[in-house]
Amino acid sequence: MDSLNEQARIEVAIIGGGVIGLACAFHLAQNGHEVVIFDPAPGRGASYGNAGGITPGWVAPTATMATLRALPRMLADPLSQLVIRPAYLPRLVPWLWQFALSARAHRVEAISKALASIAMSSVQAWTAFAEDAGVSHLIRQQGLLYVYAKSQTRTGAQPAHALRRKRGVLLQDVDQAWLQKFVPTLAPEYRYGVFAPEAAHVVDPGALCDGLLNATESLGGRLRRLAVTDVALEPTGVRLHTAKGSWLAERIVLACGAHSKELAAQLGARVPLDVERGYHAMLPTPGLELPTQLLDGEGKYALTSMRDGLRLAGTVELGGLKLAPNYARAQQLLTHAKRLLPDLDLSNPAYWMGFRPSLPDGLPVIGFAPDSKRAVLAFGHAHIGMTLAPVTANIVADLLAGRQSSFDIQPFSPSRYA
């Protein structure tokens, strides 16, 4: 971090230092822009504690009729995959209504196509991006393996897998013998699997964010460890207000994830952004290493071998930004994981909770703010911020340069809920 007085004019301010903001900052610095990142703790929010997946197959929307049918059962169990905190339910009703509208068949198809348009190239995008940023050593392309113990669970997952195949995702159905050979530590009751060989994962998301920040600073980028509390359009730029003063930026990229809603509204974008609270349990001495990232179809969570242990990550808790964490949701992951991997050492777990920025349709917001082309919005990536960071950075760079993007970004318009 370096000093930056209030009189200093900023060319491009990046509001938010998660993986999306850092990727945008690095790519813009590569393109010759002078960038300043504003974030009190870069790389230590949702980008730090996620499962690390780079998942080109994330093209099956969460909002489906099957999800809606399962909601009553899930909501009756405080430790189910999806939970709504009762105190937050009244505020969530408009979001849930939009979620239900997104579950209609024609919307599921459209949303799936939109996700595929930006997710399918994510591994290739990361390969080039990571090489430039010097973080290639943190990425492993070892695939993603969905595993199921019950035939009815496997059957219930088939519509999502069929949609992935329809979009062009490479999937291989595998049997119990294949599973036992590939993952010998897997419990024998897991008899069914689907392998996505093209997927990748990050072995240390926090270190990857640090690497992007260092690469940006090596290109002249700067960091202010401050939260932006307000923004205001002025004739010659966008005014950023913080607890320690204000700065004028010629242009800004709003990429502060779950904290973007109010700032976006100040730029004319009124979007139903809310928060999916996600949990992880980190096992420092698991006693085993996985040959691929696993997704347990029974417990609906991911298991990722990382540099500092095994990470169990998942669950969705709708409860906003202010309610206290319920770490029983992280602790239950240990029970699920022991059933999946009987030899797993559960000693000394560390628990974490973070905020996924989520729109009801499952699509991020990427595009110019309605009130000004001085502001580009890039937030709401939910479960796939890590996956989509380089692609998002490429789109943002194109927008600020006035170039025609190779991606159709209309589905991600900040005005789509207007």
Give the ranges of each region predicted by the language model.
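Beta1/beta-strand and adjacent pyrophosphate-binding region of the FAD-binding site
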Residues: 6-18
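A conserved short coil-to-beta-strand element within the FAD-binding core of flavoproteins
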Residues: 174-182, 224-238
